[in-house]
From Swiss-Prot:
This is 3-phosphoshikimate 1-carboxyvinyltransferase. Catalyzes the transfer of the enolpyruvyl moiety of phosphoenolpyruvate (PEP) to the 5-hydroxyl of shikimate-3-phosphate (S3P) to produce enolpyruvyl shikimate-3-phosphate and inorganic phosphate. Belongs to the EPSP synthase family. It comes from Synechococcus sp. (strain JA-3-3Ab) (Cyanobacteria bacterium Yellowstone A-Prime). GO terms for molecular function: 3-phosphoshikimate 1-carboxyvinyltransferase activity.
Length: 444
């Protein structure tokens, strides 16, 4: 049973006795951002089906409306965008507000840096203003960008004076799709070729979509390098956004740890740079089958059937981390219910997300009785200890909020979650969907 307090931000959850039904997974947030951006930069019309309606893509749409793109009110059925062309964004009179979305802000910086003769100011909410922007600002400056801001340009608000850019070969110290995508977008407007080499390959939605829109882009998998040639002309396309595997992950873990559960998750994106969560859960013993594999608009997808299972601990580290970075909080929940010990390393990137996700999930699971050891770059979780309902907090982070809701479903006793409403950032219908799926026999 779920009970919402009058503030609508405090949620009380009781243990569930079974999750059953079908779930239509909301559109992939990463792909939605990129479709909105490239549709705005393309010539002609771009049609997007299945767009995510979370707050983050709405922030992207609002920013690009202010930059001159014709973007109607968002819906998940069909959104038609009239683009303005690659280098013809208008200078807005207002500050561009990315809200809580690091993807919006970081990728937009790459686009704005090459808009010669125009000035832009960008900011975000309190959380985003505390997150590091130097990881994209520094390589953009190497390309010739003029960007200023707090802490030497590491923190928003930031000011951008658009100008001429030159291609560079950048060796990123972290495997980050946001860094890579920012520089590829800047490279579209730069003279020559822009190359990005990563320590491990991050998600490749930008490369796939840029190629579909007409950019001259190449990928050297062995060298972990992506290159884009400046001066490409982008042409509007039809984009079908698959379901977000990061959103599906909450249901995969929930159905695995709540007894007598069986869920069918429909139309989930199965891009190989994103499916680490499936690999890890199956290694832990989860009962997950992929059905109806297919490819739509260059992205693989399928349906996922998941049933309750006994999980066991495992090791999560190395090149696997970029393929499941957003799913680590809910995988920590799975680890707490698994027999044995789970060790997560090489995940220091989680400390600079919407919250310090390593610290947040360690703190809140510990409140529920889990044995969690925190490392600078990861966690060690000793599973098999029954979790107890407790008062927990989302840390204003949507992925922490939904992970704790999943933990509450299999804990003993009721759990009260503060800050539940932030789930809307990426998954507006998560709580109503959860209520629908809970077996009626669990109601009290």
């Amino acid at each position: 049973m779920l009970t919402t307090a009058s503030s609508a931000d405090i949620l009380t959850l009781s243990p569930a006795r079974g999750l059953r039904g079908q779930v239509s997974i909301p559109g992939d947030k990463s792909i939605s951002h990129r479709a909105l951006m490239l549709g705005s930069l393309a010539e002609g019309e771009t049609v997007i089906h299945g767009l995510s309606l979370g707050e983050d893509p709405r922030s992207t749409a609002a920013c690009f409306r202010a930059l001159g793109a014709d973007i109607p009110e968002l819906n998940s059925e069909c959104v038609r965008i009239q683009g303005v062309g690659l280098d013809r964004l208008q200078e807005p009179a207002e500050v561009l507000d990315a809200g809580n979305s690091g993807t919006t802000l970081r990728l937009m910086l790459g686009i704005l840096a090459g808009q010669a003769g125009r000035f832009f100011a960008v900011t975000g909410d309190r959380s985003l203003r505390s997150r590091p922007m130097g990881r994209v600002v520094e390589p953009l400056r190497q390309m010739g960008a003029n960007i200023w801001g707090r802490a030497g340009g590491n923190l928003a608000p930031l000011a951008v004076q658009g100008g001429s850019l030159k291609g560079i070969h950048y060796h990123s110290p972290v495997a980050s799709a946001q860094v890579k995508s920012c520089l590829l977008l800047a490279g579209l407007l730069a003279e020559g070729t822009t190359q990005v080499t990563e320590p491990a390959l991050s998600r490749d939605h930008s490369e796939r979509m840029l190629r579909a829109f007409g950019a001259e882009i190449s990928v050297d998998v062995a060298a972990k390098t992506v290159a884009v040639v400046g001066g490409s002309r982008l042409v509007g396309q039809t984009v079908q956004v698959p379901g977000d595997i990061s959103s599906a992950a909450f249901w995969l873990v929930a159905a695995s740890i709540v007894p007598e559960s069986e869920l069918l998750l429909q139309d989930v994106g199965l891009n190989p740079t994103r499916t680490g969560v499936l690999q890890v859960l199956q290694e832990m013993g989860a009962d997950i089958q992929v059905e109806k594999r297919r490819e739509v608009a260059g992205e693989p997808l399928g349906d996922l059937r998941v049933r309750s299972a006994r999980l066991r601990g495992c090791s999560i580290a190395g090149d696997l981390i970029p393929t499941l970075i957003d799913e680590i909080p809910v995988l920590a929940v799975a680890a707490a219910f698994a027999e044995g010990t789970t060790v997560i390393r090489d995940a220091a990137e989680l400390r600079v997300k919407e919250s310090d996700r390593l610290a947040a999930i360690a703190q809140e699971l510990s409140r529920m009785g889990a044995q969690v050891t925190e490392y600078p770059d990861g966690l060690e979780i000793k599973g098999g200890i029954p979790l107890q309902g407790a008062e927990v907090d989302s840390h204003a982070d949507h992925r922490i909020a939904m992970s704790l809701m999943v933990a509450a479903l299999a804990a003993q006793g009721s759990t009260t979650l503060r800050g539940a409403d932030c789930a809307r950032i990426s998954y507006p219908d998560f709580i109503p969907t959860l209520q629908r799926l809970i077996n009626p026999s669990s109601a009290s």
